């Protein structure tokens, strides 16, 4: 039996919008994912707190955007007691050891990925699918993170076929 493959899109979702939904539906199809999880972050250490809606409001906006789609909205990071992506992903893998996870991020995040805590550890922990975002692709391709991540490149077809897993 093949393991369930889950895409994870983390973020502030302040608010969630159609772009989050479109990216998720695209990734589900392109990568052959079984489901998508949206992790609504209690707080992003790289974003200012000013103007950030309460977690409950952001989770509610995410649930509205995720309706009638194989997208599960969760604020599990609060329960896990994690603040950084690397810690959240490690705990998710421990909690669901038979599940395969793929981290999704927009090219805007790849452009500044080196600012994330233990970003290389995230790449070693699970595959990362980078979704193009207009206006950010050049910066992402030229980023120090991309220079390091190139060694891990896989095609969407190899991920769909679970090659090397």
Regions found by a protein language model. Name each.
Residues 1-165:
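Nucleotidyltransferase catalytic core that binds NTPs
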């Amino acid at each position: 039996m093949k393991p369930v493959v889950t895409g994870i899109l983390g973020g502030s979702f302040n608010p969630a919008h159609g772009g989050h939904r479109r990216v998720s539906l695209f990734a589900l199809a392109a990568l052959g994912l079984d489901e998508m999880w949206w992790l609504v972050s209690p707080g992003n250490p790289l974003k200012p707190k000013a103007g950030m809606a309460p977690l409950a409001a952001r989770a509610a906006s995410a649930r509205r955007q995720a309706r009638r789609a194989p997208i599960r909205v969760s604020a599990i990071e609060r329960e896990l007691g994690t603040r950084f992506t690397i810690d959240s992903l490690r705990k998710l893998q421990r909690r669901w050891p038979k599940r395969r996870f793929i981290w999704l991020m927009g090219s805007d995040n790849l452009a500044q990925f080196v600012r994330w805590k233990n970003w290389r550890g995230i790449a070693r922990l699970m595959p990362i699918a980078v979704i193009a975002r207009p206006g950010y692709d050049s910066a992402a391709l030229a980023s120090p993170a991309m220079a390091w991540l190139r060694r891990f490149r896989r095609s969407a077809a190899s991920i769909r076929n679970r090659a090397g897993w």
